[in-house]
Amino acid sequence: MRPAARMPNLTRRSRVMIAVALAVVVLLLLGPRLVDTYVNWLWFGELGYRSVFTTQIVTRLLLFLAVAVVFGAVVFAAMALAYRTRPVFVPTAGPNDPIARYRTAVMARLRLVGIGVPVAVGLLAGLIAQNYWQRVQLFLHGGSFGVSDPQFGIDLGFYAFDLPFYRLMLTYLFAATFLAFIANLLGHYLFGGIRLAGRSGALSRAARIQLIALVGFLMLLKAVAYWLDRYELLSHTRGGKPFTGAGYTDINAVLPAKLILMVIAVICAAAVFSAIVLRDLRIPAIGVVLLLLSSLIVGAGWPLVVEQISVRPNAAQKESEYISRSITATRQAYGLTDEAVEYRDYPGNATATAQQVAADRATTSNIRVLDPNIVSPAFTQFQQGKNFYFFPDQLNMDRYRDEDGNLRDYVVAARELNPDRLIDNQRDWINRHSVYTHGNGFIASPANTVRGIANDPNQNGGYPEFLASVVGANGEVVSPGPAPLDQPRIYFGPVIANTPADYAIVGESGTPREYDYETNTATRNYTYTGSGGVPIGNWLTRSVFAAKYAERNFLFSNVIGENSKILFNRDPADRVEAVAPWLTTDTAVYPAIVNKRIVWIVDGYTTLDNYPYSELMSLSSATTDSNEVALNRLQPDKQVSYIRNSVKATVDAYDGTVTLYAQDEQDPVLQAWMKVFPDTVKPKADITPELQEHLRYPEDLFKVQRALLAKYHVDDPVTFFSTSDFWDVPLDPNPTASSYQPPYYIVAKDLAENNNSSSFQLTSAMNRFRRDFLAAYISASSDPETYGKLTVLTIPGQVNGPKLAFNAISTDTAVSQDLGVIGRDNQNRIRWGNLLTLPMGQGGLLYVAPVYASPGASDAASSYPRLIRVAMMYNDQIGYGPTVRDALTDLFGPGADATATGPAATEPPAGQAPQPQGNNQPPAAAPPNRPGQAPTPQQPEVPVAVPPTGPTQLSAGKAAALQDVNAALDALQDAQRSGDFAQYGEALQRLDDAVNKYQATN
């Protein structure tokens, strides 16, 4: 027989070159990770959250090492046993036996193969395992929920913290044992313990014992898996059922089947182990086949029979107990218990007089006419200032107190720097990263008014009224409102961070370099003085950042001095997710003025995906609406069955400081993470009153809850099973929308306290199941006293939903004719704003839709959308006009607009006198009257709850009459609270007399 060819020996030079090549490859693979690790070490330290970084690194490293060692050791042991117990003499099948050649090659590199393969397997397993560090930490630090599951009576902490870890361990034991089986099988085959030559082949005693032992251990692991499957039944979804969790078939067929299969698996494992002694391979083969057949017959066949024969004919009755479990668990898991949600019957179609509408001051004075999804171009046109400043396409809503102490909602935005808008030499490295470093200003517009009436030739009407807190031309901070601000410079924000290689080099290094503001004669620069930023004054950090950003200017530019710092990772949500990696953040991040500083407020959620009997849903699907689709701003596609808005986070817009506050201190998941990362989350008591005033009920949580309330408002399990009383989230009726209607932040009368005080709330209408009639109206309070309370107004009958209301408004003869004239020959692009649904009067609903037009003239200012009309609908009646006042008067009659907010004063063109404000101003393009409607008489000026921004001079008599109107309104509200109908009627008459007196007074 010809001897097998030997592997050629490598020369010393070849070995050195191979070693160098391997070192270069390792450096290329690990170098960027080492650089990123060091940069993150610096970044977390600068933020004060280095313990978060080190805890992650240590946990990942220990998990990697533990799993790598276990997998490597198991595979090594399997290979070593196969090698150590190999036959002394191994016959070959001839000179061309391929196994002999492989055997020779392996023997020539035995140490490399014997160590390299286990090391490679261990490294791969460790790399995968370290991604599950959160599951391990929750297992180590998780506590109890104080609530037990309805089937086994086990605390829910077992399902949240323990069961996922046990399943993870079982999965890795399966994988390790299976890999050991494969390694041992190949080893015995390679070294002759298993031979396939001849009719029956041969199997050595050592190979039989080792392989059978591994198969038996796999069966024992399968028995453990059947045991754990019992608990996972409580959070799985069976196809065709309208609820999550174990149903009748699962409890009465699948659950016993799991126990039976577990016993069969143990018996089969014992049978397999017996083959070690009995030396009969038919026994383990029979055991494996028996387990497979049992899983098909007992595990799948029997439940199918029970489902088809017993459950299907009487599904509603059979499943009612388990539906009740699902209703209770879902309400608990998503914060929809009776303590959090109040249901009230609400007519939805009650009639309302002009006096009743005027008496609803909290709502009528705050009717929102600015759509934050439309007015961003107007912000850009009038408040951009420089080409490199920018506002996001979708602005935000927040509330502030006006000068009279009244709660008002505002469209707010931070004027950020957008590096993508730099041009020409502004884009070079020095300008991009050390000159244009920050934004400037907080812009707010009252959402219930605009500057003047659109189409008035003497005024630039229809645009937002801007309150800009900025660095002024003299370097002083100009802060007219809505709250005092000391530092308007913005170094951190979502716009500035939405650029690749986003970083700014700041700090004292010679003369001030950062662009700040301009005077009439010069440009003024600024030097950053905040605490944020990683120092890069030494050569080590400069070299590290040069490697990170592949930018040699870090090494050679004189812009960087010993006091220089680098600002990076400037997106507020990303910063929060970095220091709290266990949080899922809301897609909406909004700016607010808190304690005279601009901060970004970020809502953080803790979630679970295995809460027993709770509805399992896609977070991405549940939070999708027309706004998110338009911006392509969607939540990750993760499954959740439990969610809490457990953390409120703030990010300082100037220095980037991240502060985490515990919003839901009773959340067991939050409590577990606070044990993992102690001292990183501040208690709820540390939330200042100023910050509390600007915390909003988060949009994504609200959208998840409204989707669940569509089903889980039903108490009766039989009705739930039939789905006959379900609701639907309405589609956005706007012609340009393509998804569900988003919820809207508004200031209106307080539904949580059920009084006429003003409240900032997040609201949504709900339709009947697969119909366009209203079923409910949901309001979530953001007020500090009632924060998080959900009020659900259930509406009987056939009250028009958003789609029907919008169709009625847009097809109304007067509306369509007027807008047809305005948009004739494409002179103007008509855009409908958000359709608001507002509870009004003593049981009615008012729909309000602002209408915008973007003229096509060459004038740059006129190419931006301005408010031209306000359309309303109440009980199938349409109101329409240039202002809220006009629309209310058109809809309810004279006096309905007594407490509505009118347009603010505007600056007249040069050389012209100011025009009077109010309804006595001649409308340049008043909407036509409806067919059969008498011409509307010109109404005199009427009282308003909040004076317009421009100066208004009233006569002594008129001022006294206005005081009488306000006194009558106060008396009417007192009568409403007292519930005395006689007193209420007298108060209404008093208000009517006061309004008539005001209108008659000159």
Swiss-Prot record:
Region of interest: Disordered: 891-958
Extent of Pro residues compositional bias: 937-950
PANTHER family named in the record: UPF0182 PROTEIN SLL1060 (PTHR39344:SF1)
Compartment(s): Cell membrane
Source domain of life: Bacteria
Protein name stated in the entry: UPF0182 protein Mvan_1814
Biased composition (Low complexity): 893-923
InterPro entries: UPF0182
UniProt KW keywords: Cell membrane, Membrane, Transmembrane, Transmembrane helix
Ranges annotated as spanning the membrane: 16-36, 61-81, 112-132, 174-194, 209-229, 258-278, 286-306
Family label: Belongs to the UPF0182 family.
UniProt topology in membrane: Multi-pass membrane protein
Gene Ontology CC: extracellular region; plasma membrane
